[in-house]
Amino acid sequence: MSVYLIIKSETSLVDKKQFDDWYSHEHLKEAKKDFGAISAKRGWITNSDLHVAVYEFENIKIAQKIFKSKKLKLLIQKFDNKWNSKVNRTREIVDIIQEY
């Protein structure tokens, strides 16, 4: 079953349209490529400033390796530089155990 890296970003301190454009045209594709993810999706939590990105991996070992990788650290640094550390994020790995 698939495993997902879910990144939630609180964007209330930045321009939402600029953030959305940057994520759409630059960051999502770059992160998918750097992670070697099967897929990358993103969206907004309704009626909020919370942005969610979801990266799909084949198994937990791959996701955990990415979670601890230098590539992720470099993307985090690039992200923080772009947004002057004004966007707080959480990162979780979700291991899907059942599907119908």
What are these regions (language model features)?
Residues 15, 61-63, 99:
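Residue-level signal for secondary-structure boundary sites
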Residues 15-39:
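Short amphipathic alpha-helical segments
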Residues 93-100:
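Short, low-order "capping/linker" segments at domain edges
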